[in-house]
Amino acid sequence: MKEFDGKSAFITGGASGIGLGMARAFASAGMKVAIADIKSELLSKAKADIEARGVECLTIELDVSDRTAVRQAATETVAAFGKLHLLCNNAGVGGINRPLDEAEDLDWDWVINVNLMGAVNCLLAFIPLLKAHGEGGHIINTSSVSGLRVYDGRGQGIYATTKFALVGMTEALEQDLKPLGIGVSLLCPGFVKTELPNAPRNRPAKFGGPVAPGHTSNSSLSAAAASGMEPDDCGKLVLNAIKNDEFYILTDGNERDLIQARFDRLTEAIERAAEVTF
């Protein structure tokens, strides 16, 4: 996807953080932007921000775990813009610092239904719209560096499970959509200045309500996020990756050694397997 002016994008989790950074980058390139977010109090400010860049902006209060609501959002977006060219599955939650041996049913339900099934719901609703006009398009799925390796220490399991799943799903999606002229990219941000670590404070009642403070993000991860990349810079990286049809998008090189360590363990296992005799 090389041309952006006059085309349209739909972004989940778009009213703040990385999502808003992408919205600003796309708007600056001339795209019409639909911003969907569960945090309704942020939508009006985000709309004004995007419209100030001279493009149309549609805002939709949306819980991506609600498949029916996602389909309604797709219908509303096409009614407003006519066509859809770019889908960004960016909505996500994290911050439950609870080891897997202590995790509760609703912890799993919440994170899986937002991080993984939220993306699935959007793919089901929006891919037909991307295919319909025959002009091609692009899909961004936001995973995490935690989808490439697990941070040290207990309590990261549920989040990492969903982010690893997004990596596999997106790698398969690229193969499925490539013949149709629809590009796919996998965004794996490291630490970016977002409110993700605070998400458990706002967990919906249907998933158990706010998480107890003792089980929210540990202080070291929260501090790292607070000093991370600016969301606008992340948005610019994404725009550039779409232009260049890049699949993997990482936000910095600081995780190289830790990611390499995981693949070194895999390589060692391959070498051991090659030596096995029965």
Task: Describe the residue ranges of each PLM region.
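Canonical Rossmann dinucleotide-binding motif of NAD(H)/NADP(H)-dependent dehydrogenases/reductases
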Residues: 2-34
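Active-site-adjacent segment of SDR/Rossmann-fold oxidoreductases
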Residues: 29, 149, 172-182
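The beta1-alpha1 cofactor-binding region of Rossmann-like NAD(H)/NADP(H)-dependent oxidoreductases
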Residues: 40-41, 61-72, 105
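Substrate-binding pocket helix/loop in short-chain dehydrogenase/reductase
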Residues: 98-100, 104-109
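Active-site helix of classical SDR
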Residues: 123, 162
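Residue(s) in the substrate-gating loop at a strand-loop-helix junction
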Residues: 144
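SDR active-site lid
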Residues: 179-249
